[in-house]
């Protein structure tokens, strides 16, 4: 059991209780009770560290030393689900300190901010502060993207850079939902366009789409089938050259071009849930807003 996973569980169960309340009230009650128990565990174990692999586990680690964002998310969702003001002190404590903001798998603090900003029947000062923070993040991101000749915020492309870009698209959509702004919609589209081929490599990073897309993914089910399954987003450019194959063939290449379509390159061509899910959000959000135009470069 990790503190961070327990916080995630509490948040998701609380959200589920709200979503299922009018569909299956018994299940919703079960979810809410589970959320409260998980939150009680967090409260009883404040000194518990974040997550690192146990000694006997040698596969890739998903470390998370910052736990305040998960605690915040749990408190926010339980506050929204119950209306219990006892959670407000915990929320304010985290918001007044340092916590990891973001939409990834480790830094998740922007999710609870967005839910606070959208919620009804809650403390108005909390709601306003959350909205202001989301808009501040979006404005900072917008300025960074506008300085780029490929309209993305990344300069040194990390492992899973496409996740970062899809997450940026999510943030623009979230901000637009809170305060309509054509620039947010424009740059949400630009993040989508990058993923679908408007990038230095010319690759559409979603398998099975476009004239040039990955055909040799680091994806075991596809390797068993003998061909890459369509509809999967790969990690994309990684200037860290973090596997032997990429290091051998991409050394000295510009950061945005550090991509190779080869199943041995797990740092470039891996497929994961957590960089496909933000792309689904981005595509669905753009469809929901009815935005289908192509912006002039």
Language model segments and positions:
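Hydrophobic, small-residue-rich alpha-helical packing segments that form membrane-like cores
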Residues: 36-40, 44-47
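Short, glycine/acidic-rich hinge or "gate" loops at secondary-structure transitions
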Residues: 26-30, 51, 292-296
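Aromatic (Trp/Tyr) and acidic
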Residues: 1-16, 61-93, 110-147, 155-296
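Flexible helix-coil transition and linker loops at the boundaries of alpha-helical arrays
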Residues: 48-51, 59-61
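Solenoid-like repeat scaffolds
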Residues: 95-102
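Short acidic, glycine/proline-rich loop/turn micro-motifs
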Residues: 21-22, 53-58
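A conserved hydrophobic secondary-structure block that centers on an alpha-helix together
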Residues: 1-38
């Amino acid at each position: 059991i990790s503190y961070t996973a327990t916080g995630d569980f509490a948040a998701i169960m609380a959200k589920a209780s709200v979503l299922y309340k009018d569909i299956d009230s018994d299940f919703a009650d079960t979810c809410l009770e589970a959320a409260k128990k998980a939150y009680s565990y967090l409260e009883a174990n404040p000194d518990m560290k974040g997550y690192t692999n146990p000694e006997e586990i040698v596969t890739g680690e998903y470390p998370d030393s910052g736990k305040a964002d998960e605690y915040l998310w749990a408190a926010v969702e339980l506050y929204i689900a119950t209306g219990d003001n006892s959670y407000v002190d915990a929320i304010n404590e985290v918001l007044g300190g340092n916590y990891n903001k973001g939409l990834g798998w480790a830094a998740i603090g922007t999710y609870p901010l967005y839910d606070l900003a959208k919620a009804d029947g809650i403390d108005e000062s909390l709601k306003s502060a959350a909205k202001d923070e989301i808009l501040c993040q979006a404005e900072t991101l917008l300025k960074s993207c506008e300085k780029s000749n490929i309209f993305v915020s990344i300069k040194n492309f990390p492992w899973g850079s496409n996740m970062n870009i899809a997450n940026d698209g999510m943030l623009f959509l979230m901000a637009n939902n809170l305060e309509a702004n054509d620039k947010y919609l424009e740059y949400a589209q630009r993040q989508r366009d990058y993923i679908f081929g408007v990038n230095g490599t010319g690759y559409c990073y979603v398998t099975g789409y476009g004239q040039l897309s990955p055909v040799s993914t680091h994806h075991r089910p596809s390797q068993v089938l003998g061909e890459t399954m369509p509809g999967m987003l790969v990690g994309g450019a990684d200037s860290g050259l973090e596997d032997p194959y990429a290091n051998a063939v991409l050394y000295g290449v510009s950061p945005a071009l550090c991509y190779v379509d080869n199943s041995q390159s797990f740092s470039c061509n891996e497929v994961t849930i957590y960089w496909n899910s933000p792309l689904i959000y981005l595509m669905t959000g753009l469809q929901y807003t009815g935005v289908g135009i192509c912006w002039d470069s």
